[in-house]
Structures are given as C-alpha cells and as structure tokens.
C-alpha cells in the first residue's frame, strides 16, 4: 500500500494542472532509421532469415539470438536529458531476491510527467506498430514499462524473461559515459541442445539514448552483469511488448542427484574429529530440544580445532580440481572433484557420510537417520502407509552400506545423503527454479564452512530459506568458520545462496576473498 500511496501523492491535483498546461513540450521524434520504410522492410527480412543487418544507428544481430540495437533512439538530446531528470525524481523501491538486486520505480503506465508520458506514447504507439510489422505479429496495446537504477554491486542474474504474454523485451539506456570495466553490461548467453544457457556469447555495454530489444524465446537467456563502478548509476527504461508467445519445448529435467547410504564407520571417527562437548549425551538432548522447537541450529566450534585448521589449509591446495557448476540460470559456483581431495579433506567427507555421524545427527535432531533412533508417535503416523506386517527389526538392515528400494518404486527405507565440497568466490550464487520446487522433499541440510574468518555479510554468500513462491526470507545462514548449521526443511521450503558480489574481492583487500564449505543433505 505504501508504494501506491506514494504514487498517488506524486500526482497531486496542483501538479496535475501544471502538467496539463505543458503543451509546449516538444513531441518526441524517433531515430530516423525507424521512420524509413526501406529500413523496416530490410529489418523484417533479416529477422525472419536470422541474418545480420545494419544501417546508420540501427543494427540487427542474430547471435546468440535475435536482438536489435538502435542508437540515438530519441532524436532530441534536450528531450532525453529532461526524460532522465524526470525519471531520477521518481520514487524507487529496493528489489532484492535470489535473482536480482536493484532499485525499481513504480509502474510508469499512468505517469503524467510530460517527457515520461511522451516516451511511453511513442514506444507503445508508433514504435509498437513498427515492431509488429517487423515481426509479422500483432502486438497488444498492453503498456508494461518501469524504470530501473543499478548502482554498485547491483545485478540481475541469468534468466530468459519467460512469462505468459511477453513477446519482446526492451531497454532504453540513460547512462553517463560507460565502459565495460564499469560492469552493468547486458550479457547474452549461448544455449546447448537442451535449451539451457551455457556461456556468455555477447556483452552489450550500455550507452546513452540506446534502445536494445530482443524477442522473448526459449533461448533468450541474458543477465545484467554486476555494476562495478562505485560512482555511476545505470539508469534505464525497460519493459515488454506483449503478444502471442512463441512455442516452447518441454522443460529440460536435470538428472537426479545420486543419494548414498552411510559408510560403515563406527564411533571412533567421531572421537577423532568432533568437539567432545557435542558427544555428551545430555548436551545432545539439549540440542535436540532446541532443534525440535525451531527446526534449525548452529553448532559452533564443531570440529576439534586442530582438525579444523588442517582441513582449512588443505582446501587451499592447488592439487584440488575445482569444477564449475551450472547452468547459470540455476547455479554458478565451484565443486571439488572427490578424487582430487587431500587426505584430511577426504577423511572429513567420510566423517559426514559415516554411520556414526548419521546416528549423531539423529540424536541432534530426532530424525530417523539411523535404525537405533527411537520412533515416536508422529513418525509412526508418517509411515502409516508402510507395508502391512513390517516389523521394527527389518529396519536394522538399514545399517548395511547398500540401499535397496522397496517393491513398487517406494522410497528406500535406508536413510541416504548427498553432498559436495564447494568453493565460493566473486560471482558465485545459486537460484531458485521450478524444477527444484517440484522435486522438493523433507530433508536435513548440513553446512560446514571453512576459510571465512573475515567474511562480511555485505559480501553475499549467505544461504537463504524461503517459502515456495514467496520472497520473504524465513531463515538466513551466515558463513562462519567451524560452525555446523543444521536446517530441516519441508516440501514448501526452498533455499538459495546469495550472489557473492564485488565487495568480496576489492583491490583494498589483502587477498581475493573466497570461502569453502561441506554441503550435505540427509533424507530419512
């Protein structure tokens, strides 16, 4: 309600009267190339045949997907300067979630400022008609336009703009002199045979009074790279022309992550690695009580100090092979090849997969991650659809290192886990995506960070939990050395890691900042 109220107040009666009397404001003229019939015909043919075309201030390029660049889009420099002034006087709202961080104005559909109104009329009037002729489709009169400000560390990560009704995306830049070193480029991605983004194929540096547009399609993956300039504002008008959506292929489904049962290791491994405090039965009971109240807990100084230091140092060894995890519309970070791990790192990995550790987690959380964990009434209700005649003794077989699925494709009775060793540095992130929501399960997340003693919250790299289809964060886990985070999530709770921004690697830092973590997920 606050944003609507602000918009109403900015259009108060006295101000409206003043604007209505502004008939002297010049009518906006578009780039000459757009007005030429010959150019329109040539662009239409080039777009249809997916070939390159250029004339004057207009260029059509079809790699990695069709996009058009029109420089000096609005013909009057004075008009553009006044448009910029009006836009900067608007009320802006901070927008931040897994995908983006920037400031956005209220909807400009009904704004009365003369230069904003004239630009809107030109875009969704004459230019919409021109664009419809070029594409050979009838674009709807729907007005969909807003203003965005990107400043230092603001970003819009890889996505394809897919939303019912969006046919063509456009951006009109109103920026000061801009270089690629300032960041904020519009990056266009190539795609693989599964219509998934691969890598940046082309970067468009913003420039004053330049319009960029592209058709929203299954391959129109793009991003606004992080703004690196600390004193420039990337101001733009952006929106969509609506029309019949292009046909989309079935969504690609990533292969399911392999889940493994525990490794047969006894409690000796716990005494070797873990702070004795957490092996005390009475303290485990306290932890379980707290965990059952909040479904999350952070256990500080979890590993023995000497073990933690040993693993921290080993994770920096150059022998470890780090593999980039993608695709960029879902994630971007590095994961270690298990075969390349130093001995102590591999031993820590085995600790987290050991039978003894599964039992310890059961004691911490009350979850059935080991057959010795006592059942309770709530858990019995969860399993009331189990095969008739099943007895508690059969679950003892779950201590075996091999999981066997029940007949009829039922979930394996053996608790399982999956995990990886990750490295986080400038540009790393994970995103929420539809497939993750569709495949969500009840699960226990474990995060054990290393090398983040001087990590600051403003750097990013935080693990955020949100309810499905909601932006509000339910829980945030901050990277903290040797602090074991445990979070139990249901099928409606999703997680992402916030983009690690430029502040993490500024030149005033003594070293390029990065941190590591063991990330495991356990299933009952």
Go through the PLM ranges and name each one.
Residues 2-524:
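Fe(II)/2-oxoglutarate oxygenase catalytic core
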């Amino acid at each position: 309600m606050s944003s609507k109220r602000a918009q109403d107040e900015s259009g108060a009666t006295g101000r409206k009267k003043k604007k209505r009397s502004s008939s002297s404001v010049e009518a906006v003229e578009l780039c000459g190339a757009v007005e030429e019939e010959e150019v329109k015909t040539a662009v239409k043919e080039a777009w249809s045949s997916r070939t390159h075309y250029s004339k004057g201030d207009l260029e059509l390029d079809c790699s990695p997907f069709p996009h058009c660049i029109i420089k000096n889009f609005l013909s009057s420099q004075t008009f553009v300067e006044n448009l910029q002034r009006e836009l900067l006087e608007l009320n802006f709202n901070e927008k931040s979630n897994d995908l983006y961080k920037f400031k956005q104005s209220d909807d400009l559909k009904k704004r009365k400022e003369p230069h904003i109104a004239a630009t809107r009329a030109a875009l969704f009037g004459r230019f919409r008609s021109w664009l419809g002729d070029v594409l050979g489709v009838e674009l709807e009169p729907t007005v969909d336009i807003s203003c965005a400000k990107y400043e230092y560390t603001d970003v819009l990560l890889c996505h394809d703009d897919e939303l019912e009704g969006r046919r063509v995306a456009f951006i009109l830049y109103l920026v000061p002199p801009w270089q690629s070193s300032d960041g904020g480029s519009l990056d266009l991605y190539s795609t693989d045979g599964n219509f998934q983004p691969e890598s940046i194929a082309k970067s468009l540096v913003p420039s004053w009074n330049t319009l960029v547009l592209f058709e929203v399609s299954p391959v129109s993956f793009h991003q606004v790279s992080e703004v690196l300039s600390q004193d420039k504002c990337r101001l733009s008008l952006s929106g969509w022309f609506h029309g019949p959506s292009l046909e989309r292929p079935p969504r690609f489904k990533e292969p399911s992550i392999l889940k493994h049962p525990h490794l047969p290791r006894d409690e000796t491994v716990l005494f070797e690695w873990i702070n004795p405090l957490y092996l005390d039965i009475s303290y485990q009971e306290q932890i379980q009580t707290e965990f059952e109240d909040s479904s999350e807990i952070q256990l500080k100084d979890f590993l023995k100090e000497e073990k933690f230091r040993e693993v921290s140092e080993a994770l920096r060894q150059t022998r470890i092979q780090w593999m980039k995890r993608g695709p960029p519309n879902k994630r971007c970070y590095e994961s270690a090849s298990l075969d390349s791990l130093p001995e102590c790192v591999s031993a820590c990995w085995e600790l987290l997969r050991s039978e003894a550790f599964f039992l310890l987690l059961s004691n911490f959380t009350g979850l059935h991650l080991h057959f010795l964990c006592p059942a309770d009434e709530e858990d019995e209700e969860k399993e009331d659809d189990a095969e008739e005649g099943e007895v508690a003794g059969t679950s003892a077989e779950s201590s075996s290192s091999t999981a066997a699925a029940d007949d009829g494709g039922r979930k394996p009775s053996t608790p399982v886990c999956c995990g990886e060793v990750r490295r986080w540095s400038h540009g790393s992130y994970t995103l929420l995506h539809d497939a993750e929501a569709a495949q969500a399960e009840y699960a226990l997340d474990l995060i054990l960070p290393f090398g983040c003693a001087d990590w600051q919250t403003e750097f990013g790299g935080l693990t955020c939990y949100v309810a499905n289809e909601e932006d509000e964060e339910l829980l945030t886990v901050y990277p903290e050395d040797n602090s074991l985070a445990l979070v139990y999530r249901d099928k409606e709770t999703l997680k992402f890691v916030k983009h690690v921004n430029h502040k993490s690697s500024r030149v005033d830092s003594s070293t390029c900042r990065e941190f590591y973590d063991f990330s495991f997920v356990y299933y009952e």
